[in-house]
Amino acid sequence: MRVSFKRFLTESGRFAEILQYGCGKHERELLPIGSVRKTGAFRTVGKKSALNQHSRRPDTVPLVYQSRSWNNGVFIGSITGSETTAAAAGAVGVVRRDPMAMLPFCGYNMGDYWQHWLEMGKKLGDKAPKIFNVNWFRTDDEGHFIWPGFGDNLRVLEWILKRCDNEVDAVETAIGYVPKPEDINLEGLKDFDKEKLASILKVDNAKWAKEAAGVEEFYKKFGDKLPQELRDELNGLEERTKA
């Protein structure tokens, strides 16, 4: 049944499009579907473009969501991180922020780096790609991963492409736009249904209010280097979680 889903993507032309988001330097060999244009940190195929942020969180962050705007997407990237586990040094369950997975590699102040992204959005205007965040690592009460992951991540990437084409609606939440469970193809998945999917798409405002408090502490490290736009986004998140 897994092959059936892959065949569906292939026949619809979406499998090649999805490969675009993970094929790196091999994109020209893998994608004989037209010219590929590289612009900054993202690639476009035809009229489609998307940026994908990644989180590794056992709860709070949904399986996938779309940012509310370019600035909101930069904000999402600035607060990404993972929770410490028993295998990691330090306290368990503490969120370690790694903005845009660049903290160990950025050779200058992260505040300036974020400002660069914000300026890039201004230059791109309505040509800016849509920004998404994925979190494959939601767990149940026993610590088991809920989403099957691996090749089934294509199902989520297909939804992202559909959003880029305005083919599906989404549910507005305090953090952005999440899928309707029926809009993610679950064909062939065993022991996984729309109820499980709904559980990892849920946005808990109380947890996000706590998250916002943690971001507030994190942002203090950057002092006057923190762009005002990100401060505004944090304030907006705090207000929306109270609604």
Predicted segments, located by residue:
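Conserved NTP phosphate-binding and transfer environment spanning the P-loop NTPase/kinase superfamily
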Residues: 1-243
